[in-house]
Each structure stands twice: as structure tokens, then as C-alpha cells.
């Protein structure tokens, strides 16, 4: 559930003890892992309305979040999520999240595979199958690709040698 607290100031005498704007701002994280920084570079080469900066990245356990630059330090507070889930760090690799795919436009990421809605491979993608996409082999780089239908993102796939390994969220797949 959600909880709310009302804080009430007792007197004006203690106000001289506070300096600044009263908000403790987040300190930059330690160095971002290489596998994550490569992915962030691809995001920043797209046409995002903003740049993803390392100071706005928060890593909790293995989950990577993009936080608002205005968000204060949350040290000591229990939070479910601290921003947009970018993905997860797993065994020396980064896997982007479905939430990130849904938050992007096709022009926001550099490696995009977009098919028309009437292509039979769209249904295969929605069912979680691996796709053969030989026509994208020369103009798409290997690695994480944003899979789109008519320019609208559906999810992620890992592209290599003309094959797209489906990373569509398992709970969303067609039966």
C-alpha cells in the first residue's frame, strides 16, 4: 500500500541549522559496468529527448534504473522502484527490460527491426519464437535490437547472423 506522513515544524528556532535546499541529492554511482555503458551509448546515439547520464543510473541488486535528475537521495528508505527499469545485469551481460522497450519510440534506439503488421513473423514474435530475418543482416548490427511493428516497439530481441532470438516477455506471449 501507499503511506503518507505529515511533518510539522515545531518552532522557527531550528531553521538556522539547515543549509541548502533541504534535499540531499544523489551521489554519482560507482563506475558503470562496460556491458551497460555500451547499451547506454546506443541509447544516447538515438533521438531521445534527453541523454542518459551515469549520474542518473541507479543499480539495486542486479536491476538497473534510470532515475530523475531531480530525485533526492533515498538512502535508508525502502522503495519498490526508483525510476524506469532499464534492465538487469546477468552474468557479465546486460538484458534490457520490456518496460524500457515500451517507453521508447523506434527512433530512440539505433538498432531497430521494424516489420509491417501483416508480416507473418510478427505473430511468431508475439508467440515467443525465434525469427529468421536475413534481409536485416547487412543493415543491423549484432546484439540487442528493438523489435517494432510499423514503427511501434513490441520488445527486444538479440540479433546475430540473420536470426533474432526472441526476448518478448514470457507472460505477454500468445498461446
Protein language model regions, located:
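Polybasic, low-complexity RNA-engagement segments
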Residues: 10-175
